[in-house]
Amino acid sequence: MKKKQVSHAIIISVMLSFVIAVFHTIHASELTPLAQMAEGMERQDVSIDKWTLHAKQNLSLTEKEFYQKVQRLKQEYRQYDWVIAREDKMIKAIGTYTDKKNRTSFRLQLVTTLKKHNPTSYLLYEQMSLETPDSWNDTYEQFERETLGIFQEKVVIFTCLNGHLDDNMNIVLQKKANQLLNEFQARSVEHVVEPNFVSISAFTDEWEEYIMTSKHKMNLQIALRSAGMGGKHTVTVGTPIVTTEY
């Protein structure tokens, strides 16, 4: 009788483990990258301070076409404050808008190089906030809809979250970085480890988009920095972008 009870208990335990694993898999598949990152950071006791979403569209505009597009953007996004900056061999139009109530800022940036042949141009759209939204999923999906309206096509969205760990926690940076990797079922492809800084480039099958390093696919970056004894531990998690363009 006892053997049967033990056997039944083992079967039930295995079934429960299977159900929980399936639930987590289904739950993760329903989440946007922004929501997955936020939930993963929160499970690792990271308090989120700021989040940013970026989208970019490559274009090819002459100087005349650049100004024509700027006029269209100004008419469509009248709530934005616009400035035009001319640099050495480049011209930029930057539009900014701030939702003070929700501590959220928006930026549109149109850039083109001043070349006679094959000018390089791109349009950037960015949303940044210091507030935690009611729904990470809804926020990401709203941004997707906005990018479709701006770019008139589906583009890749880049995600970045900045946060911090409790100053009183005894943190080993590399260990915490590996725990964050595990949250996203990611594997490291490149890393830099210093006494007060850890940076990891990684790849996860959770998301379709990726960029290539010299040898590997990469679609996740994790960085942790400590200010030293008693200092704040900062954490950044995001999908890889060419930051100099932003």
Swiss-Prot record:
Record's keyword terms, sorted: Signal
Range of residues in the leader sequence: 1-30
Statement: the UniProt record of this protein carries the keyword Ligase: no
Record's keyword annotation contains Signal: yes
Name this polypeptide is given: Uncharacterized protein YwmB
Gene name of the record: ywmB
